């Protein structure tokens, strides 16, 4: 890893920001619950098991989950930080991958790519500045918002977390706060019991065999199971607004602006002018803001360290890998050498693939393939829902 030490989304570790998945969906518990790197063992080792239970938390804060991951990482002796991977090639004589880093070279029979996604900004954003940036950098920048007009763009969980903290004055008391979303409302995360079935190995098994157009349709239908806002967050925001305006009778300096896309962003004096288009009535509006924060999600991006291997890799299209069920890429090298990839195959593995929900199962699937045997028992119980026909 190129970073000097372990850090998990440090820019989004803002106060009162919680995970969307239950704490048992940790590094190991789903496949090896007695493994010492379980979240429960983390609680025991830190002498807070009973207080955690008394707190009755179904989900934990992002700060605590980050601390759990850091604790696990610091106990492992095979993690190398401050190592920037510069190129990966395949040595035909050794029949091994050659990983070239800023600190030296490594040979491996198999490699796993986990470089993740890149922050997405709308096309109208030409570059980031101190007053216009992506939400993933909020806690790294910690700007002073005192007396400023603030606009948060994005109607998902990250947008909600930033809006709530700005509302509470976490970075100073703002003069005005706007929350803009393309969606027609600030929609809740779908946490229904049967929706959670999308985040199971059984569902992935059925999903991956469907035709491509059907998979795309299903991903669109299931979007709110991963991209919505938790009911707790929405209720907290609503109560904050009620208390501020109906009880304290403060000036209404908050604007909630759904059904709008930011089409143009222009510098305007020390701040910014946003031009927006309303999806439902086709109206056009402008908005002046001193600070604009884009909570607009992430985009898939091919790793920049693969120019030597790319001619050997079979692509689904120019920006998407062709990924098998066991998370290996199709490539023209020896069959005993595998290129695994994670967080890069939602189109084939379903809505759960980029999420933490199946992290332990996915890792076990990869390790079983590497070892050539079932190191972990991943056999599935009878399905609760018959996702596919019997034909």
Residue ranges, per PLM feature:
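Flavin (primarily FAD) cofactor-binding/catalytic cores of flavoenzymes
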Residues: 1-4, 8-11, 52-157, 161-391
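N-terminal low-complexity, Ser/Thr- and acidic-residue-enriched intrinsically disordered segments
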Residues: 1-29
């Amino acid at each position: 890893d190129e970073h000097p030490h372990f850090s998990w989304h440090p820019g989004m570790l803002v106060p009162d920001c919680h995970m969307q998945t239950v704490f048992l969906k940790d590094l190991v518990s789903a496949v090896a619950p007695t493994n010492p790197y379980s979240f429960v063992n983390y609680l025991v080792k830190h002498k807070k098991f009973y207080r955690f239970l008394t707190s009755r938390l179904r989900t934990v804060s992002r700060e605590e989950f980050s601390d759990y991951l850091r604790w696990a990482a610091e106990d492992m002796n095979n993690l190398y930080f401050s190592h920037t991977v510069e190129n990966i090639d395949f040595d035909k004589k050794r029949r091994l991958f050659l990983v070239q880093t800023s600190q030296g070279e490594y040979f491996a029979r198999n490699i796993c790519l986990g470089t993740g996604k890149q922050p997405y900004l709308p096309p109208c954003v030409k570059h980031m500045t101190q007053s216009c940036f992506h939400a993933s950098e909020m806690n790294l920048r910690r700007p002073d918002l005192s007396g400023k007009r603030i606009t948060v763009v994005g109607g998902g969980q990250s947008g909600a977390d930033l809006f709530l903290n700005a509302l509470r004055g976490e970075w100073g008391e703002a003069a005005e706060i706007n929350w803009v979303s393309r969606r027609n409302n600030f929609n809740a995360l779908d946490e229904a019991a049967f929706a959670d079935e999308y985040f199971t190995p059984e569902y992935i098994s059925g999903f991956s065999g469907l035709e491509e157009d059907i998979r795309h349709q299903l991903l669109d239908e299931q979007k709110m199971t991963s991209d919505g806002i938790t009911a707790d967050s929405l209720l907290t925001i609503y109560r904050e607004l009620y208390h501020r305006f109906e009880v304290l009778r403060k000036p209404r300096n908050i604007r909630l602006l759904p059904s709008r896309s930011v089409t143009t962003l222009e510098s305007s004096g020390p701040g910014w002018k946003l031009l927006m288009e309303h999806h439902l009535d086709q109206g056009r509006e402008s908005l002046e803001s001193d600070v604009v924060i884009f909570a607009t999600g992430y985009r898939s991006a091919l790793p920049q360290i693969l120019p030597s291997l790319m001619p050997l890799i079979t692509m689904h299209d120019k920006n998407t890998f062709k990924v098998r069920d066991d998370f290996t890429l199709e490539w023209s090298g020896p069959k005993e050498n595998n290129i695994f990839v994670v967080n890069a195959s939602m189109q084939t593995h379903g809505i759960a693939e980029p999420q933490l929900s199946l992290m332990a199962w996915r890792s076990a699937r990869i390790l079983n393939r590497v070892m050539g045997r079932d190191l972990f028992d991943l056999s599935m119980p009878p399905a609760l829902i018959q996702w596919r026909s019997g034909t």
